Amino acid sequence: EAMARDALRAMGLESFALRDVHTLSGGERQRLAIATLLTQAPQLALLDEPLSHLDLNHQVAVLDLFSRRARDAGLAVVMVLHDINLALRHADRALLLFGDGHHVIGPVAEVMQAELLTQLYGHPLRELADGERRYLVPG
């Protein structure tokens, strides 16, 4: 029970412990699914779009949480993200899957390049920098 309460707290859902799941919004259900995963104390988390239905503040909080768990508890995290700027901010490595079957994998700094992502998405992207942070925006 303590593990469940800790997971709910980590996701900002501690006051939802007694709520019927059917009364939760899509974002609240997504956060509950992540809390459920956390109670299992996995060594590997495979996450397909864990940020779907989440407001930006919750998206960043979830990514920060998984980054901390990876760093502090040795959790291996593999996730599908479509927000390239959040991936740039949080990922160590990236895998780009192209429609023709080829792929590019490697460190984020090498893989998440405007030229490659332009090919992937079929839309021009350009890179902006703000200090040490990089951002990719539509060209």
Where are the predicted features?
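Conserved ABC ATPase "signature" region
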Residues: E1-F16
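Conserved ABC ATPase signature
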Residues: D20-L24, E28
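Catalytic Walker B motif of ABC-type/P-loop ATPase nucleotide-binding domains
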Residues: A45-E49
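Helical segment within the ABC ATPase nucleotide-binding domain
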Residues: Q59-A73
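H-loop/switch region of ABC-family ATPase nucleotide-binding domains
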Residues: L81-H82
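H-loop (His-switch) and adjacent beta-strand-loop-beta switch element
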Residues: A94-P107
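ABC ATPase nucleotide-binding domains
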Residues: A114, T118-G139
